[in-house]
Each structure stands twice: as C-alpha cells, then as structure tokens.
Amino acid sequence: MAFLKKSIFLALFLGMVSLSICEEEKRENEGEEEQEDDEQSEMKRGLWSTIKNVGKEAAIAAGKAALGALGEQ
C-alpha cells in the first residue's frame, strides 16, 4: 500500500512539473506573438502615414497646377 501511495505521489508530482513547464513555454510563445503583432502594426502604421503624405503632396501639387491654369486664362 505504501508503495502504491509513493507511486501515485511521484506521478502527480511529475505531472505538475510537466504542466508548469508547458505553461511557462506557452507564456513565452504568447509574448513573442504579441511582439510580432506590435511590429506588424507599426509597419502598417508607417506605410499608411507614407501613403497619406504622398497623397497630400499630390493633392497640393494638383491644386497649385489647377490654380496656375486658371490664372493663365
């Protein structure tokens, strides 16, 4: 009976250690995924600001060209 109790205790202890290690690895993976998501959102934000600036400059240039064309008439 004592042998059975020790075996069960050992199995439970090893299971808890294994579970603890798995959860720690899971947390590390989630942290890495969050960093990747943050990097991707920063890239998208930078891309959209660049597109916005190019569009703004194009609109200003088009407006100046239109005013110049109206002024010549």
Swiss-Prot record:
Q: In which tissues is it expressed?
A: Expressed by the skin glands.
Q: Where is this region: Disordered?
A: 25-46
Supply the Pfam families for this chain: DD_K, FSAP_sig_propep
Signal peptide range in chain numbering: 1-22
Q: Per its UniProt entry, which superkingdom is the organism in? A: Eukaryota
List the GO cellular component terms: extracellular region
- State any GO BP term from the record: defense response to bacterium
Its organism's taxonomic lineage begins at: Eukaryota, Metazoa, Chordata, Craniata, Vertebrata
Its family remark reads: Belongs to the frog skin active peptide (FSAP) family. Dermaseptin subfamily.
The job of this chain, per UniProt, is described as: Has antiparasitic activity against trypomastigote form of T.cruzi (IC(50)=0.68 uM) in vitro but not against L.infantum. Probably acts by permeabilizing cell membranes. In vitro, shows no cytotoxicity against macrophages. Has antibacterial activity.
Matching InterPro entries, A to Z?
Answer: Dermaseptin_dom (IPR022731), Frog_antimicrobial_propeptide (IPR004275), FSAP (IPR016322)
Record keywords, A-Z? Amidation, Amphibian defense peptide, Antibiotic, Antimicrobial, Cleavage on pair of basic residues, Secreted, Signal
| Residue spans of biased composition, Acidic residues class | 30-40
Name of the protein: Dermaseptin-1
Q: Which residues form the propeptide?
A: 23-43, 72-73
Say yes or no: keyword Cell membrane present: no
Which residues are recorded with the post-translational modification Leucine amide?
L70
Zinc is among the record's keywords? no
Its subcellular locations are: Secreted
